[in-house]
Amino acid sequence: MENNVYSQIAPSIFKRIFDDTNIFHVMSSLFGMLLLVLILIWILKKISLLKINKNNYFIKTIDRMSLGPNESIVIIKIEEIKLVLGITKNHITHLYTLSSDVKDDVVDKKKEVILPTKNFNDSLKNFAKIFWKKTMFYRIIPLFFLFLFCPLVYADIPGPTSHILRDGSQTWSLPVQTLIFLTSLTFLPAFLLMMTSFTRIIIVFGLLRNALGTPYAPPNQILLGLALFLTFFIMSPTFDQVYKEAYLPFSQEKINMDEAIIKGAVPLKKFMLNQTRNSDLELFSKLAHISSYKNKDEIPMRILLPSFITSELKTAFQIGFTIFIPFLIIDLVVASVLMALGMMMVPPSTISLPFKLMLFVLVDGWQLLVTSLSQSFKI
């Protein structure tokens, strides 16, 4: 039965290959690639041969032995004279002159046995010789022809299609939607910085690290990860609302993409309005030459986004100021004690660091800080 199936499928595949109008394009592309590869190998061989001839025209390096990072012993041949040179970073010293009885073949054989070939030109030359062997050539070439009999060669990429909905709107096929989604991922960092609580959290963590006097502990990766997960925790009610009101209807094809974007922006806009000061909104409205609004829902994103970021920066610095005060007091006390004891050469930060860490641990600083940050957002 398998032989019958193969006997039915194989003729159709061969017929499709040799009767298709695209066979000329496939063959021309295949031979074009082969020709380019052969030309590239020929050019590289010529370049390597020119370099070898140019380097060995007057002086020939017979052997070389490395003694250190910048020290080596080299045997060179100038006409019939063989010199042993000691080479360092700043000097070249003549060590010995070999007798003319020593043949180059003996030295070359020792070099081949002791030292492996590390020259790129020699490796390329050897590769070209291996490639041009008949057995290797006969094994590689049939593979290119076998690719022609693979049915996947004729696979086509589905083109983008559009569909007209009942309400007259237009929607696109899934590949276009996927392309738009992947393109929108490039705006994810800007989304995290401009429309969530990430900015305030990461600034406060950075100021806390400076107040403690530990510029490398916790490391940046830990702070970014903690700020990211804390952002998802604080923004989870907003994200749930976006998921229910925008993504679910869009995935069920109840609304199109434009409506999903508009409905998804409403919860984010509400979150940003709750964190933004009125003074910042008035400032950017004045810069945009907009007098007033009937309600806050009419504020456009081009005014709300910079106002929200400005308010977040101001709030983050206010929280950082309150964090600095107890650690600053410890620094002043330690510096005063060291001055009174006459230990002016001892840096106060070295002595005050253990006291800062002890104070931060005793008051359960991380829990206190995370709780205060979470409660500082109006959701």
From Swiss-Prot:
Topology in the lipid bilayer: Multi-pass membrane protein
InterPro entries given in the database record: Flagellar_biosynth_FliO, FliP, T3SS_IM_P
UniProt key word Cell membrane: yes
GO biological process, one term: protein secretion
Domain of life: Bacteria
Localisation: Cell membrane; Bacterial flagellum basal body
Primary location recorded for the protein, binned into one broad class: membrane
Keywords attached to this entry: Bacterial flagellum, Bacterial flagellum biogenesis, Bacterial flagellum protein export, Cell membrane, Membrane, Protein transport, Transmembrane, Transmembrane helix, Transport
Keyword presence, Transmembrane: yes
One Pfam family cited in the UniProt record for this chain: FliO
GO cellular component labels: bacterial-type flagellum basal body; plasma membrane
Stretches that traverse the bilayer: 23-43, 140-160, 178-198, 222-242, 319-339, 357-377
Family under the similarity heading: Belongs to the FliP/MopC/SpaP family.
Physiological role: Plays a role in the flagellum-specific transport system.
PANTHER family: FLAGELLAR BIOSYNTHETIC PROTEIN FLIP
Listed name of the protein: Flagellar biosynthetic protein FliP
Origin species: Buchnera aphidicola subsp. Schizaphis graminum (strain Sg)
Annotated gene: fliP
